[in-house]
Design a protein with these regions (language model features):
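Interfacial segments of transmembrane alpha-helices in multi-pass membrane proteins
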Residues: 1-31, 97-102
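Residue-level signature of catalytic and energy-coupling elements of molecular machines
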Residues: 21, 48-50, 81, 117
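A cytosolic-side transmembrane-helix exit/cap motif
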Residues: 23-36, 52-61, 123-133
């Protein structure tokens, strides 16, 4: 419940900021390449949120507190998230300068989406996760977390 809710609000923030930025940039026509860039940036955000949430669950299963698990889970996913976003930003920057017309607009939309995706994954979703977890009385039940029980070998 808790992490899914944080993801939904993070993704809604991503969508609203993305739409606002695209509408404020003059002269960008939304074509098939632009739509694919929007979908790809949204999929990146979902994928990296999932990766961070998986790390949080793994950290919690080792016995850490929920707040500590969130902090170390995001810390573990930071390098992969930043690497992927930086590489894709540089690729879209190269495409932006090496192309014209429809590909030029798609590269601009993808660059914008990569930056917004990184900000929402690393900042907004994490912020909403902390907000809901600070208000939940039964934090562990709120996120449906379970600790792994150590099985004893006989």
């Amino acid at each position: 419940k808790g992490m899914g809710l944080a993801h939904v609000y993070g993704f809604l923030t991503f969508a609203l900021v993305y739409i606002l930025c695209i509408s404020l940039i003059g002269g960008v026509a939304l074509n098939i390449g632009g739509v694919l860039a929007i979908l790809f940036a949204g999929a990146m955000m979902c994928g990296f949120d999932w990766f961070a949430f998986k790390n949080i669950r793994d950290e919690f299963a080792t016995g850490k507190t929920l707040t500590s698990a969130i902090k170390s889970g995001y810390k573990k996913s930071l390098s992969l998230t930043l690497d992927a976003h930086i590489v894709l930003f540089l690729a879209s920057l190269i495409l932006y300068f090496a192309s014209f017309g429809a590909a030029h607009a798609a590269a601009l939309i993808l660059m914008l989406g990569v930056v917004i995706s990184a900000a929402c994954t690393l900042g907004v979703t994490r912020f909403f996760l902390y907000i809901w977890l600070s208000q939940a009385k039964r934090k562990i039940a709120f996120c449906n977390f379970k600790r792994e029980e150590a099985e004893e070998d006989e």
